[in-house]
Amino acid sequence: MGLICGLAIASGLTVTIPSEAQTISVNEFFPPVNRYQLGASNLGNGVNQVTSVAELRDVQPSDWAFAALQSLVERYGCLVGYPDRTYRGDAEGTLRARPLSRYEFAAGLNACLNTIEQLLQENVSVAQGDLDLLKKLAQDFQAELKQLAVRVDNLETRTAFLEDHQFSVTTKLYGQTITSLDKVFGDRVGGGSNEFQTQFAYRVRFNLETSFTGKDLFRTRLQFSNFLNGVEQTGTNMTRFNYDDNSNNNVEVSHLWYRTPLTDNLTLRLGTVGVGYTDLVDTLTPPTIADDALGIPSRFGEYDPVYRRGGGGAGFNWQITPTVQLSVGYLATNPNDPDPGNGLFNGGYHTLAQLAYQTADGGIGFTYSRSYFPAGNTDLMAGTGSLLAIQPFGEVIATAGNFYTLQGYYRITPHVQIHGWGGFVEAQAQGGGLSNLSNGVGGTVLRDVSWNSSAIWYGLVGISFPDVGGEGNLPGIALGIPPTVTASNLPGAVGQTTPYHLEAFYRIQLNDNISITPGFWVVLNPEANSNNATQYVGHIRTSFLF
């Protein structure tokens, strides 16, 4: 005993209503608005249709269709715009107080179609008279419903395009402040009392990080500081900190750098000032270690000295596979100086190529770099190691160096990680003449340099323990040999013995923004000479990140 009602909505759609359950299959009732598509059957019948005048005029509040739709809105809440689930339009209590265009009316009708469809899905009873009313309205506004579907599809396509391509240029400010209480103990290199007084100094950085596309990064860094490196007081660079910058409290643009992907696997990095290899490639050292504010405090212990190059230039990173990356870079020491012997290509420069393998737990890489320093500007080891390793042929002789280095790290467990690096440098004098070389005990010795060469070795191993003693904490130790000249064909230009660097530190993370790092390191045989007193360096570093 079933009652079968044929309800045609749009083109030949029928709805079957079983009388026992008084429910209607949604798919058998009416399709969503996106089914109203123009098809060949509508256009290919060979008969030119003449549009009725009634199909062109607006729907007036006095029209039966207007009243019919308003009754559906009131009974089923098709158009809900206010907290009390009513739609008030231009006059409270009405669908609209003014005439509606046929497309406005079709939009309201479509809303009621969707609402009643939802009710049928939930097995809610719908009056037969209302179904008949919907049938009549859908037939009268079939053309507008079809066009509405097309317009909605076009709007969705345009919206998706805007979501994929629209990006608002965003700049974020990041701040970092380091304060440190430092003291060096032990007689000065070469004898005499150590004049390094207890130092309490600071360094402040503000990074303005901007993205133009959502995938690139442009960084501008403002920095001011008042640290002194203490070399004059101790007689060696082996006691230096990695944050001992000094701008005499003047604000300066210390870093200008840009990174952008060129393809899915190729990235360009470039900058004009304060750019180092650390901005072009990965140092293959745990990020918790290679960080001025949060990592190991000594200059030598932070990362391989091969990366301590600065100036302006560019680099490319090619991600060959998800774990293998090839990087190349070029830096000029004074790219902004147009004087002879300077500039981007006619002064001091550094080139680098690095092949690295990295996974989530660690990585290893081989790095080759060549550096050239004009006469009067030699700093081969970038302020680390012995003075003889920094200037193996003295300051007045132009010097080149070929670096062959290996770096790696591995996270054994979530709370144990190891790292290390080692390097060999082939130093070459780029000319000749009389030059004063460091004698390793605080003085110099005069030598006649003539295209000589020297060998420099260095290395370090370390172990650290992330989150041991508290979340964010980092205790660690390191043992290394600072850069030292081990062989030379220039008489008197070799270190007398091997220096050693032993360091321990413990970063205590007070909260997300503040940490305190007490620690110390010991330098045995500073300046590669056993006649020098052992240097003891102590510090308490406090870092603020915001």
Swiss-Prot record:
PROSITE patterns given in the database record: SLH
One Gene Ontology cellular component: membrane
Gene3D superfamilies for this protein: Carbohydrate-selective porin OprB
GO biological process terms on file: carbohydrate transport
Taxonomic superkingdom: Bacteria
Domain SLH positions: 52-123
InterPro entries according to UniProt: Carb-sel_porin_OprB (IPR007049), Cell_Envelope_Struct_Comp (IPR051465), OprB_sf (IPR038673), Por_som-like (IPR047684), SLH_dom (IPR001119)
GO function term, MF aspect, one: porin activity
Family to which the UniProt record says this protein belongs: Belongs to the OprB family.
PANTHER family: OUTER MEMBRANE PROTEIN ALPHA, OUTER MEMBRANE PROTEIN ALPHA-RELATED
Name the UniProt record assigns to this protein: Uncharacterized protein sll0772
Organism, scientific name: Synechocystis sp. (strain ATCC 27184 / PCC 6803 / Kazusa)
